[in-house]
Amino acid sequence: MGKARGVNNGVNESSLGYLFGSGQPSSAAAATMGTTTTTTTTTTTDGTGGRPITTTTTTVTDNKKTSAGVRGSPNNYFRSEGQNCGNFLTDRPSTKVHAAPGGGSSLDYLFGGPSPAGSGNK
């Protein structure tokens, strides 16, 4: 008899298990998550016809990946004014707006604003 719809035996766990299941990886997947183990077996002889020598080497490699939103670069330090302030990386001037809303603008000459004081226009 077939399985009921939506029931999973845990062998081929869906990556969307957090939506349809417990959200926890199976114990076998949790034990191996983030690491890779490689075992190499080498058999050699000393050339005189003696007993073969078997050597086994096991290597464990850490495969941790950085999740989204986790700061991984030492240059990405916390900035109280936001991530795009200052010339910390590009050595260019800031594009931060310095005039108050409704206040003076350096673009008044384009939009017919008041002329700067002392310009001689009356």
Curated annotation (Swiss-Prot):
Keywords assigned: Microtubule, Phosphoprotein
A GO cellular component entry from the record: cytosol
Tissue localization of expression: Ubiquitous. Preferentially expressed in above-ground organs.
Record carries keyword Phosphoprotein: yes
Modified residues (Phosphoserine): S73
Region (Disordered): 1-78, 96-122
Domain of life: Eukaryota
Bias (Low complexity): 32-61
InterPro entries associated with the record: SPR1/2/3/4/5
GO BP annotations listed: cortical microtubule organization
PANTHER family, sorted: PROTEIN SPIRAL1-LIKE 3 (PTHR33403:SF26), SPR1 (PTHR33403)
Function: Acts redundantly with SPR1 in maintaining the cortical microtubules organization essential for anisotropic cell growth.
Family: Belongs to the SPIRAL1 family.
Protein name: Protein SPIRAL1-like 3
Organism whose genome encodes this protein: Arabidopsis thaliana (Mouse-ear cress)
Name of the gene: SP1L3
